[in-house]
Amino acid sequence: MTTPHGLLQYSSGAFSDQVPADDSAEEHGVKDHAMLAPFTAAWQTAISPPLVIERSEGCYVYDVNGTKYLDALAGLLSTALGGSEPRLVKAATEQLNKLPFYHSFWNHTTRPSLDLAKELISMFTAREMGKVFFTNSGSEANDSQVKIVWYYNNALGRPKKKNIISRTQSYHGTTFISASLSGLPTLHQDFDLPGRFVLHTDCPHYWRFHLPGETEEEFATRLADNLENLILKQGPETIAAFIAEPVIGAGGVILPPKTYFEKIQAVVKKYDILFIVDEVITGFGRLGTMFGSDLYNIKPDLVSLAKALSSAYAPIGAILVSPEISDVIHSHSNKLGTFAHGFTYSGHPVSCAVALEALKIYRERDIPGHVTHVAQRFQEGIKAFAAGSPIVGETRGVGLLIATEFTDNKSPYELFPFEWGVGEIFGQECKKRGMMVKVLGNLIAMSPPLIITREEIDKLVSIYGEALKATEERVAELKSKKN
Protein backbone atom coordinates (compact mmCIF):
# COMPACT_ATOMS: atom_id res chain seq x y z
CA MET A 1 0.00 0.00 0.00
CA THR A 2 1.19 3.52 -0.67
CA THR A 3 0.19 6.33 1.65
CA PRO A 4 -0.64 9.84 0.43
CA HIS A 5 2.96 10.77 1.28
CA GLY A 6 4.32 7.98 -0.86
CA LEU A 7 5.51 5.75 1.96
CA LEU A 8 5.55 2.12 0.98
CA GLN A 9 3.72 -0.36 3.17
CA TYR A 10 3.65 -4.12 3.19
CA SER A 11 0.41 -5.48 1.81
CA SER A 12 -1.33 -8.80 1.49
CA GLY A 13 -1.81 -8.46 -2.23
CA ALA A 14 -4.73 -7.82 -4.55
CA PHE A 15 -8.03 -9.45 -3.70
CA SER A 16 -8.89 -10.08 -7.34
CA ASP A 17 -5.81 -12.06 -8.28
CA GLN A 18 -5.78 -14.83 -5.70
CA VAL A 19 -6.16 -18.37 -7.02
CA PRO A 20 -9.00 -20.34 -5.36
CA ALA A 21 -8.20 -23.54 -3.54
CA ASP A 22 -8.45 -26.76 -5.55
CA ASP A 23 -8.26 -30.49 -4.86
CA SER A 24 -4.45 -30.42 -4.86
CA ALA A 25 -4.55 -28.37 -1.65
CA GLU A 26 -6.18 -31.30 0.14
CA GLU A 27 -3.82 -33.74 -1.53
CA HIS A 28 -0.73 -31.91 -0.29
CA GLY A 29 -2.14 -31.21 3.17
CA VAL A 30 -1.98 -27.42 2.98
CA LYS A 31 -5.67 -26.49 3.02
CA ASP A 32 -6.62 -25.03 6.43
CA HIS A 33 -3.02 -25.49 7.59
CA ALA A 34 -1.85 -24.87 11.15
CA MET A 35 0.71 -22.11 10.49
CA LEU A 36 0.28 -18.53 11.60
CA ALA A 37 2.04 -17.27 8.50
CA PRO A 38 4.30 -14.19 8.45
CA PHE A 39 3.07 -11.17 6.48
CA THR A 40 -0.07 -13.03 5.40
CA ALA A 41 -3.72 -12.11 5.91
CA ALA A 42 -6.20 -14.75 7.09
CA TRP A 43 -8.44 -14.25 4.06
CA GLN A 44 -5.58 -15.30 1.78
CA THR A 45 -5.29 -18.68 3.46
CA ALA A 46 -9.06 -19.10 3.34
CA ILE A 47 -9.40 -18.69 -0.41
CA SER A 48 -5.96 -19.73 -1.59
CA PRO A 49 -3.68 -22.33 0.00
CA PRO A 50 -0.01 -21.41 0.25
CA LEU A 51 2.34 -22.12 -2.60
CA VAL A 52 4.47 -24.92 -1.18
CA ILE A 53 8.04 -24.97 -2.45
CA GLU A 54 9.54 -28.45 -2.30
CA ARG A 55 13.04 -28.27 -3.74
CA SER A 56 15.59 -25.93 -5.30
CA GLU A 57 18.27 -26.11 -7.94
CA GLY A 58 20.57 -23.20 -8.73
CA CYS A 59 18.45 -20.12 -9.38
CA TYR A 60 15.24 -22.16 -9.58
CA VAL A 61 12.70 -23.52 -7.11
CA TYR A 62 10.02 -26.16 -7.64
CA ASP A 63 6.62 -26.42 -5.97
CA VAL A 64 4.90 -29.63 -4.83
CA ASN A 65 3.26 -29.96 -8.24
CA GLY A 66 6.63 -29.87 -9.99
CA THR A 67 6.21 -26.37 -11.41
CA LYS A 68 9.55 -24.65 -11.96
CA TYR A 69 10.13 -20.99 -11.06
CA LEU A 70 13.06 -18.67 -11.61
CA ASP A 71 13.57 -17.29 -8.12
CA ALA A 72 14.10 -13.62 -8.90
CA LEU A 73 14.07 -12.68 -5.22
CA ALA A 74 16.56 -15.28 -3.93
CA GLY A 75 14.22 -16.52 -1.22
CA LEU A 76 14.03 -13.23 0.64
CA LEU A 77 17.13 -11.57 -0.80
CA SER A 78 19.13 -14.28 0.92
CA THR A 79 20.03 -17.40 -1.13
CA ALA A 80 23.03 -15.69 -2.69
CA LEU A 81 24.62 -18.96 -3.85
CA GLY A 82 21.40 -20.45 -5.17
CA GLY A 83 19.52 -23.44 -3.87
CA SER A 84 21.89 -26.34 -4.50
CA GLU A 85 25.44 -25.46 -3.51
CA PRO A 86 27.01 -28.83 -2.56
CA ARG A 87 29.82 -27.28 -0.53
CA LEU A 88 27.35 -25.71 1.88
CA VAL A 89 25.42 -28.97 2.23
CA LYS A 90 28.69 -30.79 2.88
CA ALA A 91 29.76 -28.24 5.51
CA ALA A 92 26.45 -28.64 7.33
CA THR A 93 26.52 -32.45 7.12
CA GLU A 94 30.08 -32.75 8.39
CA GLN A 95 29.39 -30.42 11.31
CA LEU A 96 26.14 -32.23 12.18
CA ASN A 97 28.04 -35.49 12.30
CA LYS A 98 30.86 -34.01 14.39
CA LEU A 99 29.12 -31.62 16.81
CA PRO A 100 25.49 -30.67 16.06
CA PHE A 101 25.32 -28.14 18.89
CA TYR A 102 27.13 -26.55 21.76
CA HIS A 103 26.57 -23.13 23.30
CA SER A 104 28.84 -20.09 23.55
CA PHE A 105 27.93 -19.02 27.11
CA TRP A 106 30.28 -18.78 30.13
CA ASN A 107 33.54 -18.79 28.19
CA HIS A 108 32.65 -21.93 26.22
CA THR A 109 32.35 -21.99 22.44
CA THR A 110 33.06 -24.05 19.31
CA ARG A 111 35.71 -23.97 16.60
CA PRO A 112 33.33 -22.91 13.77
CA SER A 113 32.17 -19.84 15.72
CA LEU A 114 35.75 -18.78 16.45
CA ASP A 115 36.82 -19.30 12.84
CA LEU A 116 33.82 -17.43 11.44
CA ALA A 117 34.35 -14.45 13.74
CA LYS A 118 37.98 -14.20 12.62
CA GLU A 119 37.00 -14.44 8.95
CA LEU A 120 34.35 -11.71 9.26
CA ILE A 121 36.79 -9.33 10.92
CA SER A 122 39.21 -9.98 8.06
CA MET A 123 36.60 -9.62 5.33
CA PHE A 124 35.09 -6.30 6.42
CA THR A 125 37.61 -3.70 5.28
CA ALA A 126 35.63 -0.43 5.28
CA ARG A 127 37.18 0.15 8.70
CA GLU A 128 38.79 -1.93 11.43
CA MET A 129 36.43 -4.03 13.51
CA GLY A 130 37.24 -5.59 16.87
CA LYS A 131 34.74 -8.30 17.82
CA VAL A 132 31.79 -10.29 16.44
CA PHE A 133 28.56 -11.12 18.27
CA PHE A 134 26.40 -13.87 16.73
CA THR A 135 22.62 -13.88 16.45
CA ASN A 136 20.14 -15.98 14.49
CA SER A 137 18.72 -13.34 12.14
CA GLY A 138 18.95 -9.76 10.96
CA SER A 139 16.10 -8.79 13.26
CA GLU A 140 18.00 -10.16 16.26
CA ALA A 141 21.16 -8.42 15.10
CA ASN A 142 19.49 -5.02 14.94
CA ASP A 143 17.66 -5.66 18.21
CA SER A 144 20.98 -6.51 19.85
CA GLN A 145 22.62 -3.42 18.36
CA VAL A 146 20.41 -1.17 20.47
CA LYS A 147 21.13 -3.12 23.65
CA ILE A 148 24.86 -2.91 22.92
CA VAL A 149 24.62 0.84 22.33
CA TRP A 150 22.72 1.33 25.60
CA TYR A 151 25.21 -0.84 27.49
CA TYR A 152 28.08 1.14 25.98
CA ASN A 153 26.66 4.52 26.99
CA ASN A 154 25.82 3.32 30.49
CA ALA A 155 29.39 2.11 30.83
CA LEU A 156 30.60 5.59 29.87
CA GLY A 157 28.31 7.25 32.41
CA ARG A 158 25.91 8.67 29.82
CA PRO A 159 22.54 7.25 30.91
CA LYS A 160 20.53 9.83 28.94
CA LYS A 161 22.19 8.98 25.61
CA LYS A 162 19.68 6.30 24.57
CA ASN A 163 17.57 7.45 21.60
CA ILE A 164 18.14 5.91 18.17
CA ILE A 165 17.51 7.75 14.90
CA SER A 166 16.31 5.70 11.95
CA ARG A 167 14.69 6.69 8.65
CA THR A 168 11.18 6.51 7.30
CA GLN A 169 10.79 3.71 4.76
CA SER A 170 13.64 1.71 6.30
CA TYR A 171 13.31 -1.95 7.28
CA HIS A 172 15.38 -3.35 10.14
CA GLY A 173 13.32 -6.36 11.29
CA THR A 174 10.22 -7.32 13.25
CA THR A 175 11.24 -7.81 16.89
CA PHE A 176 10.09 -5.11 19.32
CA ILE A 177 13.26 -3.08 18.89
CA SER A 178 14.00 -3.79 15.23
CA ALA A 179 10.39 -3.13 14.17
CA SER A 180 10.53 0.12 16.13
CA LEU A 181 13.64 1.05 14.16
CA SER A 182 11.87 0.22 10.90
CA GLY A 183 10.16 3.16 9.22
CA LEU A 184 7.19 1.25 7.76
CA PRO A 185 3.82 2.00 9.41
CA THR A 186 2.45 -1.49 8.73
CA LEU A 187 5.07 -2.94 11.08
CA HIS A 188 3.85 -0.65 13.86
CA GLN A 189 0.07 -0.83 13.41
CA ASP A 190 -1.66 -2.42 16.44
CA PHE A 191 1.66 -3.68 17.82
CA ASP A 192 1.97 -0.53 19.97
CA LEU A 193 5.12 0.47 18.11
CA PRO A 194 7.47 2.20 17.68
CA GLY A 195 9.08 2.40 21.09
CA ARG A 196 9.63 5.89 22.46
CA PHE A 197 13.40 5.59 22.10
CA VAL A 198 13.20 5.71 18.28
CA LEU A 199 13.08 8.87 16.18
CA HIS A 200 12.60 8.79 12.42
CA THR A 201 14.20 11.20 9.99
CA ASP A 202 13.76 11.67 6.24
CA CYS A 203 13.69 8.90 3.66
CA PRO A 204 16.43 9.69 1.10
CA HIS A 205 14.25 8.98 -1.94
CA TYR A 206 15.22 11.73 -4.37
CA TRP A 207 12.62 10.94 -7.05
CA ARG A 208 9.72 11.17 -4.64
CA PHE A 209 10.81 13.81 -2.15
CA HIS A 210 13.10 16.33 -3.88
CA LEU A 211 11.91 19.91 -4.23
CA PRO A 212 11.43 21.48 -7.68
CA GLY A 213 14.82 22.30 -9.16
CA GLU A 214 16.70 20.62 -6.31
CA THR A 215 19.75 18.58 -7.33
CA GLU A 216 20.68 15.29 -5.67
CA GLU A 217 23.50 16.97 -3.76
CA GLU A 218 21.19 19.77 -2.60
CA PHE A 219 18.63 17.17 -1.55
CA ALA A 220 21.32 15.34 0.43
CA THR A 221 22.37 18.59 2.08
CA ARG A 222 18.77 19.34 3.09
CA LEU A 223 18.35 15.87 4.60
CA ALA A 224 21.62 16.20 6.52
CA ASP A 225 20.47 19.60 7.80
CA ASN A 226 17.14 18.09 8.85
CA LEU A 227 18.98 15.34 10.71
CA GLU A 228 21.12 17.89 12.52
CA ASN A 229 18.06 19.95 13.43
CA LEU A 230 16.37 16.83 14.83
CA ILE A 231 19.45 16.07 16.93
CA LEU A 232 19.59 19.64 18.25
CA LYS A 233 15.87 19.68 19.00
CA GLN A 234 16.07 16.45 21.01
CA GLY A 235 19.44 17.28 22.54
CA PRO A 236 22.67 15.63 21.33
CA GLU A 237 23.19 14.23 24.83
CA THR A 238 20.08 12.04 24.30
CA ILE A 239 20.96 10.60 20.85
CA ALA A 240 22.95 7.37 20.99
CA ALA A 241 23.03 6.09 17.42
CA PHE A 242 21.90 6.49 13.83
CA ILE A 243 21.03 3.36 11.84
CA ALA A 244 20.82 3.04 8.06
CA GLU A 245 20.93 0.51 5.26
CA PRO A 246 23.41 1.44 2.48
CA VAL A 247 20.48 0.91 0.12
CA ILE A 248 17.02 0.74 1.65
CA GLY A 249 16.01 -2.78 0.62
CA ALA A 250 12.67 -4.16 1.76
CA GLY A 251 11.35 -0.60 2.02
CA GLY A 252 11.52 -0.15 -1.74
CA VAL A 253 15.12 -0.35 -3.04
CA ILE A 254 15.95 3.30 -2.39
CA LEU A 255 19.45 4.36 -3.35
CA PRO A 256 21.17 7.19 -1.48
CA PRO A 257 21.47 10.45 -3.42
CA LYS A 258 24.93 11.73 -4.29
CA THR A 259 27.00 12.84 -1.24
CA TYR A 260 24.28 11.61 1.16
CA PHE A 261 26.36 9.34 3.38
CA GLU A 262 29.31 11.73 3.35
CA LYS A 263 27.08 14.44 4.81
CA ILE A 264 25.15 12.20 7.19
CA GLN A 265 28.34 10.74 8.65
CA ALA A 266 29.72 14.23 9.25
CA VAL A 267 26.62 15.13 11.27
CA VAL A 268 26.60 12.04 13.49
CA LYS A 269 30.34 12.30 14.10
CA LYS A 270 29.96 15.95 15.11
CA TYR A 271 27.59 15.00 17.93
CA ASP A 272 29.34 11.80 19.08
CA ILE A 273 26.56 9.57 17.74
CA LEU A 274 27.36 5.99 16.76
CA PHE A 275 26.69 4.88 13.18
CA ILE A 276 25.07 1.45 12.79
CA VAL A 277 25.08 0.17 9.23
CA ASP A 278 22.51 -2.51 8.43
CA GLU A 279 24.19 -4.73 5.82
CA VAL A 280 21.67 -7.57 6.16
CA ILE A 281 20.67 -7.23 2.49
CA THR A 282 23.68 -5.44 1.01
CA GLY A 283 26.40 -7.61 2.52
CA PHE A 284 28.42 -10.23 0.58
CA GLY A 285 28.21 -8.95 -2.97
CA ARG A 286 24.63 -7.92 -3.68
CA LEU A 287 25.65 -4.45 -4.90
CA GLY A 288 28.81 -5.57 -6.71
CA THR A 289 31.07 -4.86 -3.73
CA MET A 290 31.61 -7.19 -0.79
CA PHE A 291 29.66 -4.78 1.42
CA GLY A 292 27.48 -1.75 0.80
CA SER A 293 29.82 0.21 3.05
CA ASP A 294 32.56 -0.27 0.44
CA LEU A 295 30.39 1.19 -2.31
CA TYR A 296 29.25 4.26 -0.38
CA ASN A 297 32.38 4.86 1.72
CA ILE A 298 30.61 4.28 5.03
CA LYS A 299 32.80 4.02 8.15
CA PRO A 300 30.43 2.46 10.70
CA ASP A 301 30.88 1.81 14.39
CA LEU A 302 28.63 -1.25 14.27
CA VAL A 303 27.52 -3.54 11.43
CA SER A 304 24.53 -5.90 11.17
CA LEU A 305 24.81 -9.00 8.97
CA ALA A 306 22.53 -11.95 8.11
CA LYS A 307 20.81 -13.42 5.01
CA ALA A 308 23.70 -14.07 2.58
CA LEU A 309 26.03 -14.69 5.53
CA SER A 310 25.09 -18.37 5.15
CA SER A 311 23.32 -17.98 1.80
CA ALA A 312 20.26 -18.71 3.99
CA TYR A 313 21.20 -22.40 4.26
CA ALA A 314 21.17 -22.05 8.05
CA PRO A 315 19.79 -19.28 10.28
CA ILE A 316 22.52 -16.91 11.41
CA GLY A 317 23.14 -13.21 11.94
CA ALA A 318 26.09 -11.25 13.25
CA ILE A 319 27.16 -7.90 14.63
CA LEU A 320 30.58 -6.44 13.95
CA VAL A 321 31.71 -4.22 16.81
CA SER A 322 34.43 -1.58 16.54
CA PRO A 323 37.45 -1.89 18.85
CA GLU A 324 36.46 1.30 20.66
CA ILE A 325 33.07 -0.14 21.60
CA SER A 326 34.24 -3.69 22.32
CA ASP A 327 36.94 -2.38 24.67
CA VAL A 328 34.32 -0.49 26.69
CA ILE A 329 32.04 -3.54 26.76
CA HIS A 330 34.87 -5.72 28.04
CA SER A 331 35.75 -3.26 30.81
CA HIS A 332 32.12 -2.88 31.88
CA SER A 333 31.51 -6.63 31.84
CA ASN A 334 34.43 -7.00 34.25
CA LYS A 335 32.80 -4.44 36.53
CA LEU A 336 29.37 -6.12 36.40
CA GLY A 337 30.68 -9.67 36.34
CA THR A 338 29.29 -10.54 32.91
CA PHE A 339 28.04 -9.27 29.55
CA ALA A 340 24.51 -10.57 30.09
CA HIS A 341 23.27 -10.80 26.53
CA GLY A 342 23.11 -13.74 24.13
CA PHE A 343 20.93 -16.47 22.68
CA THR A 344 20.90 -20.25 23.00
CA TYR A 345 21.87 -20.48 19.35
CA SER A 346 24.42 -17.62 19.28
CA GLY A 347 27.30 -19.00 17.25
CA HIS A 348 25.50 -22.26 16.47
CA PRO A 349 28.26 -24.55 15.15
CA VAL A 350 26.29 -25.82 12.15
CA SER A 351 25.24 -22.33 11.06
CA CYS A 352 28.78 -21.05 11.58
CA ALA A 353 30.28 -23.93 9.58
CA VAL A 354 27.91 -23.22 6.69
CA ALA A 355 28.57 -19.47 6.85
CA LEU A 356 32.32 -20.00 6.93
CA GLU A 357 32.12 -22.09 3.76
CA ALA A 358 29.88 -19.47 2.13
CA LEU A 359 32.46 -16.77 2.82
CA LYS A 360 35.17 -18.94 1.27
CA ILE A 361 33.04 -19.31 -1.87
CA TYR A 362 32.39 -15.55 -2.09
CA ARG A 363 36.12 -14.95 -2.08
CA GLU A 364 37.27 -17.90 -4.22
CA ARG A 365 34.70 -17.28 -6.95
CA ASP A 366 34.86 -13.48 -6.65
CA ILE A 367 31.09 -13.26 -6.33
CA PRO A 368 31.12 -9.43 -6.10
CA GLY A 369 33.12 -9.38 -9.34
CA HIS A 370 30.58 -11.66 -11.01
CA VAL A 371 27.77 -9.37 -9.86
CA THR A 372 29.57 -6.39 -11.38
CA HIS A 373 30.04 -8.36 -14.61
CA VAL A 374 26.35 -9.24 -15.06
CA ALA A 375 24.67 -6.28 -13.32
CA GLN A 376 24.71 -3.99 -16.35
CA ARG A 377 22.82 -6.58 -18.41
CA PHE A 378 20.32 -6.99 -15.55
CA GLN A 379 19.78 -3.29 -14.85
CA GLU A 380 19.69 -2.12 -18.47
CA GLY A 381 17.43 -4.97 -19.57
CA ILE A 382 14.79 -4.15 -16.96
CA LYS A 383 15.06 -0.38 -17.44
CA ALA A 384 14.68 -0.70 -21.22
CA PHE A 385 11.24 -2.28 -20.80
CA ALA A 386 10.23 0.07 -17.99
CA ALA A 387 11.25 3.27 -19.79
CA GLY A 388 8.46 3.01 -22.34
CA SER A 389 5.76 1.80 -19.97
CA PRO A 390 2.90 4.17 -19.10
CA ILE A 391 2.43 2.48 -15.72
CA VAL A 392 6.03 2.62 -14.47
CA GLY A 393 6.93 5.69 -12.44
CA GLU A 394 10.50 4.79 -11.58
CA THR A 395 12.86 1.85 -11.91
CA ARG A 396 15.84 2.03 -9.57
CA GLY A 397 18.59 -0.34 -8.60
CA VAL A 398 22.24 -1.22 -8.27
CA GLY A 399 24.08 -4.50 -8.71
CA LEU A 400 21.62 -7.41 -8.59
CA LEU A 401 18.93 -5.43 -6.80
CA ILE A 402 16.19 -3.50 -8.58
CA ALA A 403 12.67 -2.20 -8.01
CA THR A 404 9.89 -1.06 -10.30
CA GLU A 405 7.37 1.38 -8.84
CA PHE A 406 4.02 1.58 -10.58
CA THR A 407 2.44 5.04 -10.86
CA ASP A 408 0.36 6.82 -13.46
CA ASN A 409 1.92 9.23 -15.96
CA LYS A 410 5.39 8.51 -14.53
CA SER A 411 4.61 10.79 -11.62
CA PRO A 412 5.58 10.06 -7.99
CA TYR A 413 2.30 11.62 -6.93
CA GLU A 414 -0.26 9.98 -9.26
CA LEU A 415 -0.72 6.70 -7.45
CA PHE A 416 -2.87 3.84 -8.65
CA PRO A 417 -5.73 2.92 -6.30
CA PHE A 418 -4.47 0.39 -3.79
CA GLU A 419 -7.44 -1.88 -4.40
CA TRP A 420 -6.32 -2.36 -8.00
CA GLY A 421 -3.30 -4.24 -6.71
CA VAL A 422 -1.09 -3.30 -9.66
CA GLY A 423 2.01 -4.80 -8.07
CA GLU A 424 0.15 -8.01 -7.29
CA ILE A 425 -1.16 -8.20 -10.86
CA PHE A 426 2.42 -7.99 -12.10
CA GLY A 427 3.53 -10.58 -9.57
CA GLN A 428 0.85 -13.02 -10.67
CA GLU A 429 1.73 -12.48 -14.33
CA CYS A 430 5.35 -13.33 -13.51
CA LYS A 431 4.27 -16.41 -11.58
CA LYS A 432 2.19 -17.61 -14.53
CA ARG A 433 5.35 -17.42 -16.62
CA GLY A 434 7.50 -19.22 -14.07
CA MET A 435 9.17 -16.44 -12.10
CA MET A 436 8.96 -15.21 -8.50
CA VAL A 437 9.26 -11.52 -7.64
CA LYS A 438 8.69 -9.59 -4.44
CA VAL A 439 5.46 -7.58 -4.33
CA LEU A 440 5.20 -4.55 -2.06
CA GLY A 441 1.92 -2.79 -2.82
CA ASN A 442 2.38 -0.84 -6.05
CA LEU A 443 6.03 -1.79 -6.24
CA ILE A 444 7.88 -4.96 -7.16
CA ALA A 445 11.48 -5.84 -6.39
CA MET A 446 13.90 -8.37 -7.82
CA SER A 447 17.12 -9.66 -6.27
CA PRO A 448 18.12 -12.93 -7.94
CA PRO A 449 20.80 -15.26 -6.57
CA LEU A 450 24.26 -13.79 -7.06
CA ILE A 451 25.30 -16.80 -9.15
CA ILE A 452 22.77 -15.97 -11.89
CA THR A 453 24.16 -16.34 -15.42
CA ARG A 454 23.80 -13.99 -18.37
CA GLU A 455 21.43 -16.49 -20.00
CA GLU A 456 19.27 -16.61 -16.88
CA ILE A 457 19.24 -12.82 -16.76
CA ASP A 458 18.00 -12.76 -20.34
CA LYS A 459 15.18 -15.11 -19.34
CA LEU A 460 14.35 -12.98 -16.30
CA VAL A 461 14.24 -9.81 -18.40
CA SER A 462 12.07 -11.48 -21.03
CA ILE A 463 9.52 -12.62 -18.44
CA TYR A 464 9.58 -9.14 -16.90
CA GLY A 465 8.73 -7.61 -20.29
CA GLU A 466 5.86 -10.03 -20.92
CA ALA A 467 4.44 -9.53 -17.43
CA LEU A 468 4.71 -5.76 -17.77
CA LYS A 469 2.77 -5.77 -21.03
CA ALA A 470 0.03 -7.94 -19.49
CA THR A 471 -0.12 -5.63 -16.46
CA GLU A 472 -0.42 -2.57 -18.70
CA GLU A 473 -3.41 -4.18 -20.41
CA ARG A 474 -5.05 -4.98 -17.07
CA VAL A 475 -4.51 -1.43 -15.79
CA ALA A 476 -6.05 -0.06 -18.99
CA GLU A 477 -9.13 -2.22 -18.32
CA LEU A 478 -9.36 -0.97 -14.73
CA LYS A 479 -9.06 2.62 -15.92
CA SER A 480 -11.84 2.17 -18.46
CA LYS A 481 -14.13 0.69 -15.81
CA LYS A 482 -13.35 3.58 -13.47
CA ASN A 483 -14.20 6.11 -16.17
From Swiss-Prot:
What top-tier enzyme class does this entry carry? Answer: transferase
The alphabetized list of GO BP terms reads: biotin biosynthetic process; gamma-aminobutyric acid metabolic process
| Compartment(s) | Cytoplasm
A Gene Ontology molecular function term of the record: 4-aminobutyrate:pyruvate transaminase activity
Superkingdom per UniProt? Eukaryota
Does this UniProt record's set of keywords contain Electron transport?
A: no
Instruction: Spell out the GO cellular component terms annotated for this protein, sorted alphabetically and separated by semicolons.
Output: cytoplasm
Return the CDD domains for the record: OAT_like
Reaction catalysed by this chain? Answer: 4-aminobutanoate + pyruvate = succinate semialdehyde + L-alanine; 4-aminobutanoate + glyoxylate = succinate semialdehyde + glycine
Pfam short name (any one): Aminotran_3
Which positions does the record annotate as the modified residue N6-(pyridoxal phosphate)lysine?
307
| Residues binding pyridoxal 5'-phosphate | 138-139, 278
Function of this protein?
A: Transaminase that degrades gamma-amino butyric acid (GABA).
Q: Which PANTHER family match?
A: ADENOSYLMETHIONINE-8-AMINO-7-OXONONANOATE AMINOTRANSFERASE, GAMMA-AMINOBUTYRATE TRANSAMINASE 4-RELATED
Q: What is this protein called?
A: Probable gamma-aminobutyrate transaminase 4
